């Protein structure tokens, strides 16, 4: 029992995070130097994301009986994303207005370091809904894979899958090759995941060593408020959706606990993407649904980021005494409904989208971003964790709506009853 515990990835990552926190706290300079370990692990994961998405989507679509089913899955997924993302935005807006973490700070925007956020503001100006949509189309297929742009790879994979499906029996050889290649890729993922504890240790040691636990105190109320809001969203909103769909959110969280710990250590939900594709399929969701919903959700279903954006924007208004009436807040909500969809496609995602939103709304001081800059790194864990759980729940929900969910397998796996390799008929 003890041997299996020590060998489990869950235990190893949790231990690594704890050691990283201790090193960063007691030896901050040494902790800050551990950054390359975390960066290297995230780069290894990003290296494999594009081929994983390509193989999963192509084999999923090409193996389907009807192309109408693919279109239906995509439409249902986008509808779900829009509804739940809107709920997340409203959830953050309500709680930040009730708690008012920025009230009483009385910060003069003129005293803030505008230069500290100048780079983010400049990047934000380059972002827009048209630019985001145009960026989905790659300049070249090789460029899409080289840059690791999830949506570009997804677009090419969908088109490739459609074309391969139309070939019928003539395309069977290509299908078999891609499926075999997919098995090799997942073998590589298993090897990379053995390094997860080292990556989590390096990233956590760097965060605590560079920013220090003390930097949390001044703006701690916002951080605590944000974390509680994310927990409430997962338990109440996603929990209700899960219950209606037929499973327990707590059992689901236990099922993906290793992926959650990897995300906690690296602060990047992308670091768990390859494993989530595999795990959601093992949970009973058909491969074609998993291949469409998970990658698309990384740009269109960022629940944690949505909560962060509304809370951070209103916090800046409260801290700088910038009045926001109901009209201003509705305007903020509408702008965020559009701008939040590009969050995963931008380097520094959440913070840059926040800068773009504040610039677009107009009546909030852009310099107020400096208040958030110092603590943004500590809020990224809650964002990433909520995003991951949200995308996992979305996959199960969409799979059920389009009748591509194996309910018996879902129940068996979440209750630890299904032996490896056991399959069931897909229910309708």
UniProtKB/Swiss-Prot annotation:
Its main location: membrane. GO terms for biological process: L-aspartate transmembrane transport. InterPro entries: C4_dicarb_transport, Na-dicarboxylate_symporter, Na-dicarboxylate_symporter_CS, Na:dicarbo_symporter_sf. Keywords: Cell inner membrane, Cell membrane, Membrane, Symport, Transmembrane, Transmembrane helix, Transport. The chain crosses the membrane at residues 5-27, 47-64, 77-99, 141-163, 184-206, 216-238, 289-311, 326-348, 353-375. GO terms for cellular component: plasma membrane. Coiled coil: none annotated. Pfam families: SDF. It is a multi-pass membrane protein. One of its GO terms (molecular function) is succinate transmembrane transporter activity. It is found in: Cell inner membrane. Responsible for the transport of dicarboxylates such as succinate, fumarate, and malate from the periplasm across the membrane. Belongs to the dicarboxylate/amino acid:cation symporter (DAACS) (TC 2.A.23) family. This is Aerobic C4-dicarboxylate transport protein.
